[in-house]
């Protein structure tokens, strides 16, 4: 697996959870001897929703809700077979979405 790169993209609503997961991935990859670049914080996606408070009148009275999606990007340069096995066995929290691409 020489001259290859693994790109890992993490997505979560809770930034504490995503930072902890990113640190676990970095520690695991460094323990197996791989070079890690990142985690790079990507821009947070914010979705806002306005909802009417009243079911009938009072259009000017609204509640506002938002969902923040935090993103992190990491590259693992020249991963070994040990690195791939260790990353596959890694147990991450349920609130973190992981996308892995081999380049």
Curated annotation (Swiss-Prot):
GO molecular function: structural constituent of ribosome; tRNA binding
Span of the signal peptide: none
GO CC terms: ribonucleoprotein complex; ribosome
A Pfam family per the record: Ribosomal_S10
GO BP field: translation
UniProtKB keywords: Ribonucleoprotein, Ribosomal protein
The keyword Signal is annotated on this UniProt entry: no
NCBIfam families named in the record: PRK00596.1, rpsJ_bact
Function noted in UniProt: Involved in the binding of tRNA to the ribosomes.
Protein family per UniProt: Belongs to the universal ribosomal protein uS10 family.
Summary of subunit composition and partner proteins: Part of the 30S ribosomal subunit.
Protein name (Swiss-Prot/TrEMBL): Small ribosomal subunit protein uS10
